[in-house]
Curated annotation (Swiss-Prot):
Chief location category: cytoplasm
CDD domains: AAK_G5K_ProB
PROSITE patterns linked: GLUTAMATE_5_KINASE
Name by which UniProt lists this protein: Glutamate 5-kinase
Pathway: Amino-acid biosynthesis; L-proline biosynthesis; L-glutamate 5-semialdehyde from L-glutamate: step 1/2
Species lineage: Bacteria, Bacillati, Bacillota, Clostridia, Peptostreptococcales
UniProt GO molecular function: ATP binding; glutamate 5-kinase activity
E.C. no: 2.7.2.11
């Protein structure tokens, strides 16, 4: 089923989590970004349009400055994101250029999705970029996001983007193969749920874990993202971004993953 969905989908949103994007020491994983860009270039060559939702601005800021990492003051966090966003986009631009692909940046807040004028402007920008062969790269605008207007996690941001753009598929790349009935990092007998059609029924059967190391979204936010896009009949795949060839393996039906969908 994964292969069928991948091949039938023309408009694909791919979300990259902080844990996927970072090395163990918190620095940007350039090998991963290069592998990602190569696979996106393949998908574009197959006639698909791709939008990337990326996390990682804060860890990129910490990596670049090597300070402030333990300061919890909001101003410091936002300053790190301002520094790191430049580093992050520079990395994407450099690696995509190896494949002849240009990128465009969109930094968004919750208000952008729920204000009619802003919503329309984002839609028009996205459609124009992809129609011209550009890969849009989206992140939350952390430097202006306060509690009242922030989305809070990029799983939700990716889900909002997929519905706004009328995507055919949302792919979340995390540091696990998909949804398990219990935490695979703690239990060797954890079983992967390959297909989920009813999220409420699934929640009765699994144990939901904690937030991850570098990011703001744990399993709960990924499940909620699936719920959001499934309402619009958009399937969602949760796969392991630590597998550098994950997109190709999904395309070739060789990867472990969980797909959420509605009949």
């Amino acid at each position: 089923m994964l292969q069928d969905v991948m091949k039938k989908s023309k408009k694909i949103v791919i979300k990259i989590g902080s844990n996927t994007l970072s090395n163990v020491d918190g620095t940007i994983n350039h090998d991963f970004i290069e592998a990602l860009c190569q696979q996106v270039a393949f998908l574009v060559g197959e006639g698909k349009q791709v939008v990337i939702v990326t996390s990682g601005a804060r860890i990129a800021g910490i990596s670049r400055t090597n300070k402030w990492s333990r300061k919890e003051d909001m101003n410091y966090k936002q300053a790190l994101c301002a520094i790191g966003q430049v580093e992050l986009m520079s990395a994407y631009n450099s690696h995509f250029s190896h494949h002849g692909i240009y990128i465009g940046q969109l930094l968004l807040t919750r208000e952008d999705f729920f204000d009619k004028t802003r919503n329309l402007n984002i839609r028009n920008t996205l459609f124009t970029l992809v129609d011209e062969g550009i890969v849009p790269i989206i992140n939350e605008n952390d430097t202006v996001s306060v509690e009242q207007i922030k989305i809070g996690d990029n799983d939700t941001l990716a889900a909002y983007t997929a519905t706004l753009w009328n995507a055919d598929l949302l792919i979340l790349l995390s540091d696990i193969d998909g949804i398990y009935n219990k935490n695979p990092k703690e239990y060797e007998d954890a079983e992967l749920l390959e297909q989920v059609q009813n999220i409420d029924d699934m929640l009765k059967e699994i144990e939901v874990g904690e937030t991850n190391s570098f990011g703001t979204g744990g399993i709960e936010t990924k499940i909620e993202a699936a719920r959001i896009v499934n309402r619009y009949n958009i399937p969602m795949i949760l796969g392991n971004g630590k597998n550098k060839e994950i997109l190709m393996k999904l395309y070739q039906n060789e990867a472990k993953a969980t797909i959420f969908f509605r009949e």
